[in-house]
UniProtKB/Swiss-Prot annotation:
Entry's localization field: Cell inner membrane
Organism: Shewanella baltica (strain OS155 / ATCC BAA-1091)
Keyword Cytoplasm: no
Physiological role: Could be involved in insertion of integral membrane proteins into the membrane.
Protein name according to UniProt: Putative membrane protein insertion efficiency factor
């Protein structure tokens, strides 16, 4: 059974997918992480909801710069108490 999305989750994921389809191909691959920041944002919103997922995505995007080594950075699980 598919999980239903709230209207805010739908809006946020649609905006991110729009970025993936229309803007990202023009800019080319720039993300230092696996999964990419946009995929991370969609997964974080699905797992944690809109507010907390967007917060995780913002923190991740702020780490995505040339001085950070990047690498693997999965979305923390929902029941993880360290992600407050």
């Amino acid at each position: 059974m598919a999980q239903t999305q709230s209207p805010l989750q739908w809006l946020a994921t649609t905006l991110i997918r729009g970025y993936q389809v229309f803007i990202s191909p023009i800019l080319g691959p720039r993300c230092r992480f696996n999964p990419t920041c946009s995929h991370y944002a969609i997964e974080a919103i699905k797992v944690h909801g809109t507010a907390k997922g967007c917060w995780f995505a913002l923190k991740r995007i702020l780490k995505c710069h040339p001085l950070h080594p990047g690498g693997s950075d999965p979305v923390p699980p929902k029941n993880d108490r360290c992600n407050k």
